[in-house]
Amino acid sequence: MSEDHGKDYTLESDSELRFEIEQKDAKVLVSLVSGFAELFGTELVKKKQYEFGVGAKVAIFTYQGCVLHVSGKMDVCYISKETPMVQYVNCHAALEQFRMEAEEKDRYGPVAMVVGPMDVGKSTLCRILLNYAVRVGRRPLYADLDVGQGSIAISGSVATILIERPANVEEGFAKTAPLVYHFGHKSPSGNSVLYNAVVSKMAEVTLQSLNSNKRTKSSGIIINTCGWVKGSGYAHLLHAAKAYGACAIFVLDQERLYNELLRDVPKGVHVVLLPKSGGVVERSKELRHEARDQRIKEYFYGNTRAPFYPFSFEVKFQDLRLYKIGAPPLPDSCMPIGMKAEDNKTKVVAVTPTPALIHHVLALSFAESVEDDVIGTNVAGFCCVTEVDMERQAVMLLSPQPRPLPPNALLLWSELQFMDNHT
């Protein structure tokens, strides 16, 4: 561990400065002294100070060379010449070629999926490709299918946003008006049938939305995926590629997956094998759990730069319309005539409030009734059960919006839990 009160780092062309922060109260300040540099595709402004805190894993890259001033406590800090950024910018150039053709012929722009096992830098590559697209005047859509470590909405959901400007260096992309669908589990294995149904619905709605704006239509979609790439996880990748009509699949750091996709996807789909960055860090189960918790906490409370002040209010059991998607599995022989066991996986069932509901995150659906297409309806937001009072027949909810719940509010159960100990 080194404490750095201020040091200039001189980077040659095509190199990057990497550092990690693991200490809870540590703070690192970075500024660009001279030259040109970028963080995951976002250009750094000269002399502006950028602040990074605990959990930050940063790689600042320069094409032409630069000097960076860095101060603060870091667990690791070094300069590397071994970087895949040139291959990544070549991927952007290929996508840009597709976009120019799409613009000329008034067609859909490229739909590119980024796939690979856990901890290879999938979301980082998505961020780089999106930033480069925006910097040349495009307006792509970003679809995040990673229900375990999503970067748009909280875990347990899939989401899409329109990218109109480069990501903020410290905070990432603006999460304005996301299209969010509820899944309710931390992995597609929680309910494979439901996961495919939700991905298909979001793909359908997203592709339709491309027609409403010519610039977005030709800009296309960048898709982030889960790190589960074997067995059923691989089947989910194939399903997503088909649902979105992917024309390019970027495979990070796994030749086996690359060769399987070459074999199984239609011939017109470009499958490209890419190296992962040496700066990618493997995360333990505990770190993943902490990251999920942090995303939920930020949803309700914001961060130090932009704090939110959520509301707590009581809802009586009789006013709570709470449901879960997916009934307990039954053998085909026990199912009604014409139904299969997998139909149970997408069944909407009522949930009776019990003390077991405490700390669970609930999604507020735009559906007004269980007679509606609940699975195919996006969600307005989330709340969390902080208290269950069986005596008073009421629950206490933590919500970004004040009471009451909207009329006919339909809440959907999630296996995700959040301990609200914010002070």
From Swiss-Prot:
Gene3D superfamilies recorded: Clp1, DNA binding domain, P-loop containing nucleotide triphosphate hydrolases, Pre-mRNA cleavage complex subunit Clp1, C-terminal domain
Binding, ATP: E16, K57, D119, V120, G121, K122, S123, T124
GO cellular-component term (any): tRNA-intron endonuclease complex
InterPro entries registered for this protein in UniProt: Clp1, Clp1/Grc3, Clp1_C, Clp1_C_sf, Clp1_N, Clp1_N_sf, CLP1_P, P-loop_NTPase
Keyword annotations of the record: ATP-binding, mRNA processing, Nucleotide-binding, Nucleus
CDD domains listed in its UniProt record: SIMIBI
Localisation per UniProt entry: Nucleus
GO biological process, one term: mRNA 3'-end processing
GO molecular function: ATP binding; polynucleotide 5'-hydroxyl-kinase activity
Entry's transmembrane regions: none
Family according to the record: Belongs to the Clp1 family. Clp1 subfamily.
Role according to the record: Required for endonucleolytic cleavage during polyadenylation-dependent pre-mRNA 3'-end formation.
HAMAP family attached to this UniProt entry: Clp1 (MF_03035)
Protein name: Protein CLP1 homolog
